[in-house]
Amino acid sequence: MEAFAIAKFQRHGSRKVGLVLDQIRGKNVKKAEEMLPFIEKRTAELVYKTVHSAAANLEVKSGKKLDLSKVYIKEAYANIGPMSNLRRIQPGPQGRAMPYKKSMCHLTVVVSDEKGGR
């Protein structure tokens, strides 16, 4: 059985979230939740909350309490979110405008109680 959690419109870059996701992909949920507080990235807290939510969704879906050491992270990925509303302009030299963009991402975590997957 599978369950998933999606965190949309998060104010982190998808590449930076991907660095944390690479470290937990394929591991069991208990081990991932123990590892994440010690990863020194700002995005680790976001990933922790999403993994915890996906595991809770699986418990609700199955209708019974699950052992988190037997629940595995099947898929974990971050997609690029919209950038249209987070464009800003900074004054540049000689009266020019220098635009910069603040990035967003959508984070998806899929957990399964069967070992294997991708």
From Swiss-Prot:
One of its GO terms (cellular component) is cytosolic large ribosomal subunit. Keywords: Ribonucleoprotein, Ribosomal protein, RNA-binding, rRNA-binding. This is Large ribosomal subunit protein uL22. This protein binds specifically to 23S rRNA; its binding is stimulated by other ribosomal proteins, e.g. L4, L17, and L20. It is important during the early stages of 50S assembly. It makes multiple contacts with different domains of the 23S rRNA in the assembled 50S subunit and ribosome. Belongs to the universal ribosomal protein uL22 family. The gene is rplV. InterPro entries: Ribosomal_uL22, Ribosomal_uL22_bac/chlpt-type, Ribosomal_uL22_bac/org-type, Ribosomal_uL22_sf. It comes from the Bacteria. GO terms for molecular function: rRNA binding; structural constituent of ribosome. The keyword Ribosomal protein applies. HAMAP family: Ribosomal_uL22_B (MF_01331_B). The keyword GTP-binding does not apply. Part of the 50S ribosomal subunit. One of its GO terms (biological process) is translation.
